[in-house]
Amino acid sequence: MLEQMGIAAKAASYKLALLSSCEKNRVLEKIADELEAQMESILSANVQDVEQARANGLSEAMLDRLALTPARLKAIADDVRQVCNLADPAGQVIDGGLLDSGLRLERRRVPLGVVGVIYEARPNVTVDVASLCLKTGNAVILRGGKETHRTNAATVLVIQKALKACDLPEAAVQAIDNPDRSLVSEMLRMDKYIDMLIPRGGAGLHKLCREQSTIPVITGGIGVCHIFVDSSADIAPALKIIVNAKTQRPSTCNTVETLLVHQDIAERFLPALSKQMAESGVTLHGDETVMQALHGPAKLVALKPEELDNEFLSLDLNVVVVENMDGAIAHIREHGTQHSDAILTCDMHNAARFVNEVDSAAVYVNASTRFTDGGQFGLGAEVAVSTQKLHARGPMGLEALTTYKWIGFGDGTIRA
């Protein structure tokens, strides 16, 4: 089954690579229209997925990840339309020039070909990835989690209907709808057909892909994000940033999970933090210093060492008091995932040092980690957030779904 999907996807990718930007935008507009027109069927499938997930005991954080509402689905359709407004990188000439030999050389962006994406309980990923791949002239094979297999299947049918209406192969966007986990291992070995693989899920999925894939893999999306409250931080705006970074949407990978507090500001800052977190419904997981310093009003539990390496994806926040900037940077290097980290400070020397020494895909000064997002960065919908350093890093927009080829123009030109 998968080999036939790969053959069809590869054939579709050749046709997609020839489309003009206008033709690709026409497809995307049709997809957005169909998502709204077929909203009832998608939401009906999603309700079944959510009910099944709840019966299986999934956490509220996970249920929020997989749930769709009319407003969320409308926002997804609007995101597709926003992709239409983005510049198409395919075909762009990056650089080039006339060589001494008389050969005119240029380096041109081209589609990757076929992209494979393995993801878990986020049904919006189906549309986000499909729209970005189509915009850049790539075909895509999707393998969503079993928790959302009905939603994903319904969504892909809508996308394929739009492709067919635009006289394009339905195989340009395909989904593996069989929940059999052994198919993931089979997909990881489809290097004959898939040019790049992107896993979006937990640490276990990323480890599996790194160890078993014969396809180049872009890993990321695991966000143990930190905020360091420096000794010079202005407490009022610092609290506002922390509330945003923790509570705006706790189930996302750019949510702060650990707060590092400079010991020189801890006595003044921690009581204010506790009051604010109590109002926001956040449970604090405190180290020994925090446990001794606070006695309410926020719910406070003792921090377990293993929690420093975990994504809560819920209204829980680690709070650790550090001796100085060195301690904060060392902590992030040991426990961070190179996703998004921030410093809150009024000392620009410390800010510059933090930016230079924290090796994450996104580093912020006096701002929320929640900004690490393709839309917020002006990239449109993102296919993933890469925490590795090769090919792509940070939110992966359109350019990350292209490679380049060298093209030489001559006039009977030969090498001397």
From Swiss-Prot:
GO terms for biological process: L-proline biosynthetic process. GO terms for molecular function: glutamate-5-semialdehyde dehydrogenase activity; NADP binding. The keyword Oxidoreductase applies. Its EC number is 1.2.1.41. Keywords: Amino-acid biosynthesis, Cytoplasm, NADP, Oxidoreductase, Proline biosynthesis. CDD domains: ALDH_F18-19_ProA-GPR. Catalyzes the NADPH-dependent reduction of L-glutamate 5-phosphate into L-glutamate 5-semialdehyde and phosphate. The product spontaneously undergoes cyclization to form 1-pyrroline-5-carboxylate. Belongs to the gamma-glutamyl phosphate reductase family. This is Gamma-glutamyl phosphate reductase. It comes from Salmonella typhi. The gene is proA.
